[in-house]
């Protein structure tokens, strides 16, 4: 074989090897792990801006897209999830796609958040005197030291902090210091619908049904596209996710629940920036 052919074959082999390594790296990021940089202080002091987290996708199962025609303005998420090792647990830190845009649930790729799970499907979550309380979990949720700061700080001192909470409905009347109880639906759960329930679950129901949810308080009736409904059966699992820095975190207290499909994976390792 001539020197020229040997050089050519060597270059081809290097290119093939590099392409194979790149393909393997992409496959690993899709199915096994991925990494994200923390952009805000919402998880302080646990995670600080600039920290990197490695997400284990094997634990709950990797999410595989079935439609790669992404719309940066929001769209329906089309995907399935591979079989995982375990379900999400209380106090897991997860990375997920921000679920709410323009007041409704929609999917935008590469718009992510990192928060702590304080309620899983089937739980009832409350904030009582500033502290998270869960009917199915009697240990601390999040950082109680930060929750203590929340309850000890007078409202008059909380400049720039939104005290009202999801669903921002006067009849429900929830605040970040006194919230819930809010039931976190799981697949197959049936909830009898009152106007207050409709206000709480409107976003999730409209996402699942593709119909407008309204209500008449005087008649105590809830409507889906104008048709009365007495109860609703949920089609998805949901999670309540919140930042450890309860004084400065945009989370489920303000925009509601995270659909399971939007969760990318569970944080397995942190690489601190300093």
Regions found by a protein language model. Give the residues of each.
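N-terminal signal-anchor transmembrane helix
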Residues: 36-46
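Soluble "head" domains of membrane/secretory-pathway proteins
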Residues: 3-8, 44-274
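Secondary-structure boundary/capping signal
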Residues: 35-36, 102
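Hydrophobic membrane-insertion alpha-helices, especially the h-region
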Residues: 12-31
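Cytochrome P450 fold signature focused on the C-terminal beta-domain
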Residues: 34-35, 119
């Amino acid at each position: 074989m001539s020197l020229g052919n040997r050089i050519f074959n060597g270059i081809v082999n290097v290119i093939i090897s590099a392409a194979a390594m790149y393909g393997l790296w992409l496959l690993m990021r899709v199915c096994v792990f991925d990494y994200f940089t923390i952009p805000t202080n919402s998880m302080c002091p646990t995670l600080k801006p600039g920290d990197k987290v490695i997400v284990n996708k094997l634990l709950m199962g990797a999410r595989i897209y079935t439609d790669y025609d992404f719309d940066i303005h929001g769209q329906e998420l089309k995907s399935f999830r591979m079989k995982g090792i375990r379900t999400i647990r209380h106090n897991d830190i997860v990375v997920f796609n921000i679920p709410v845009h323009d007041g409704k649930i929609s999917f935008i790729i590469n718009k992510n958040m990192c928060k702590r799970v304080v309620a899983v499907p089937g739980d009832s979550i409350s904030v009582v005197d500033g502290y998270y309380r869960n009917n199915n979990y009697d240990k601390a949720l999040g950082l109680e030291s930060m929750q203590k700061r929340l309850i000890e700080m007078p409202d008059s001192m909380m400049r720039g902090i939104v005290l009202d909470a999801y669903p921002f409905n006067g009849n429900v009347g929830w605040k970040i210091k006194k919230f819930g109880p809010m039931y976190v639906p799981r697949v197959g759960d049936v909830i009898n619908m009152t106007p207050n329930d409709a206000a709480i679950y409107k976003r999730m129901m409209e996402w699942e049904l593709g119909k407008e949810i309204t209500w008449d308080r005087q008649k105590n009736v809830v409507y889906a596209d104008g048709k009365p409904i007495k109860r609703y059966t949920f089609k998805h699992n949901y999670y309540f996710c919140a930042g450890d820095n309860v004084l400065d975190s945009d989370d489920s207290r303000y925009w509601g629940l995270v659909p399971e499909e939007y969760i990318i994976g569970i944080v397995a390792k942190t690489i601190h920036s300093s």
